[in-house]
Amino acid sequence: MKQELSTGEILDLLPHRYPFLLVDRILEQKENKIIGVKNVTINEPFFQGHFPGHPVMPGVLILEAMAQTGGVLMFSKEENKGKIPLFAGIDKARFKKPVYPGDRLIIKVEIVRMVKGIGKAKAEVYVDDNLVAYAELLFTAV
């Protein structure tokens, strides 16, 4: 398992493509933990309507960035090569602060349990060392 991954290497693992790829780089990867980055720019398509004159990243896309980062971790594992990651559920999601254009999301995901092909993960997103969102995620693969 490679420690750092570029966007190209992420594209080899995930089926997501522009404009829906929401993780730009992997900074660190261990057996059950990963740290990813999403650089949020004013050019993101969702800022056109969310909200005009006061752009804020939609919370559901922050959750999707968490899920994609967790997906990179799952699909870096040999036993999951060639499968498609699916987001199976979410619990305890909270948004603490808004995310604006120019923010750099640091996305931390830890897989805490794998049972019969379903993984449970804890995820946190930070901007400038401030917690902006967290959730528990469920993953599976087909």
Model-derived segments and spans:
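Intrinsic-disorder/low-complexity, polar/charged segments enriched in Ser/Thr/Lys/Arg/Asp/Glu/Gln
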Residues: L21, E31-I35, R104-I106, K120, ...
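Catalytic strand-loop segment that frames the active site of acyl-thioester-processing enzymes
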Residues: Y18-M57
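Short aromatic-glycine motifs in intrinsically disordered, low-complexity regions
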Residues: T7-R17
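Hydrophobic beta-strand-centered segment that forms part of the acyl-chain substrate-binding groove
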Residues: K2-E4, G70-I106, V132-E136, T140
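Flexible glycine-rich active-site/ligand-binding loops centered on an Asp-His dyad
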Residues: M57, V125-V142
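Beta-strand-rich interaction surfaces with strong enrichment in secreted/lumenal proteins
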Residues: L11, G53, F95-K97
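Active-site helix/loop of acyl-thioester processing domains in fatty-acid/polyketide metabolism
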Residues: I26, M57-N80
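Hydrophobic beta-sheet segments that form the core/acyl-binding groove
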Residues: I26, D91-D128
